[in-house]
């Protein structure tokens, strides 16, 4: 489990995350939702130690984040940021192999190669593994980055807006893959997501943020309801039950 205690981050004296406390369940998909500027990505970055914490603590498996050695943490937790700009031209296989760096520092062992092969197969990329990233569609490229995270083989997988710039078909594909990571491989997935209907259909737990604070957190029924969503987003919602999913209608 990941526990967040009174986490705060400020820029120029203004809090973008303020006194956030959470318990993120293990072996589940947890989605951070909320309007722009709610502090979702900042919170995710602090949990992953990419961003300095101004106040508060994060505990991973009851061990305070600052006490984890970098090598240990990179085998426990991985993060895929929203922007992944790589200046060298890589094939899919070369990218996925980077996921094994915490274990082999670039000198791949038979065990590392096995993990790379399994990640490529899992993401259905084996047949195009030697293609270059700049030759791929948006959906293929995102699958390649997720394969890299799978190869890293961490218990906790953090993703910052993994559906960014993807069409509906590829967004559904990615969310189904994340669901499989939890259900088949036992991973704990934490993601920032803007589309609340994807959050509703694929998450186990949702954290609603606004102005750097947690408005509410809980299971689907506790968050995907009219009063809570209207408080988070300050707009009108209708909730429809469609094929056992709660679908938010907010276009009118």
Positions of predicted regions on the chain:
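The feature captures the beta-strand-to-loop junction immediately N-terminal to the Walker
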Residues: 33-35
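Helix-to-loop junction immediately C-terminal to a conserved catalytic motif
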Residues: 48
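Conserved ABC transporter NBD signature motif
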Residues: 56-64, 73
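Conserved ABC ATPase "signature" region
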Residues: 97, 110-128, 153, 158
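Conserved ABC ATPase signature
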Residues: 132-136, 140
């Amino acid at each position: 489990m990941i526990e967040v205690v009174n986490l705060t981050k400020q820029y120029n004296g203004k809090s973008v995350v303020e006194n956030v406390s959470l318990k993120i369940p293990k072996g589940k998909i947890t989605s951070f939702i909320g309007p722009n500027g709610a502090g979702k990505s900042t919170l995710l970055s602090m949990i992953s130690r990419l961003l300095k914490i101004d106040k508060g603590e994060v505990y991973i498996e009851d061990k305070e984040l600052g006490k984890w050695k970098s090598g240990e943490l990179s085998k426990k937790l991985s993060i895929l940021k929203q922007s992944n700009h790589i200046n060298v031209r890589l094939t899919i296989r070369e990218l996925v192999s980077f996921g094994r760096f915490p274990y082999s520092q670039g000198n791949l062992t038979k065990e590392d190669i096995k993990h790379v092969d399994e990640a490529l197969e899992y993401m259905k990329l084996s047949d195009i593994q030697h293609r270059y990233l700049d030759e791929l569609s948006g959906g293929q490229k995102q699958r390649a980055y997720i394969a890299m995270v799978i190869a890293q083989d961490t218990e906790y997988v953090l993703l910052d807006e993994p559906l960014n710039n993807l069409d509906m078909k590829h967004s559904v594909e990615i969310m189904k893959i994340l669901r499989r990571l939890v259900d088949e491989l036992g991973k704990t997935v934490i993601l920032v997501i803007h589309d609340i209907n994807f959050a509703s259909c694929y998450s186990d737990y949702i954290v609603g943020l606004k102005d750097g604070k947690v408005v509410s957190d809980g299971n689907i029924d506790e968050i995907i309801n009219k009063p809570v969503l209207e408080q988070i987003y300050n707009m009108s919602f209708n909730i429809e039950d469609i094929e056992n999913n709660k679908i938010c209608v907010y276009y009118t």
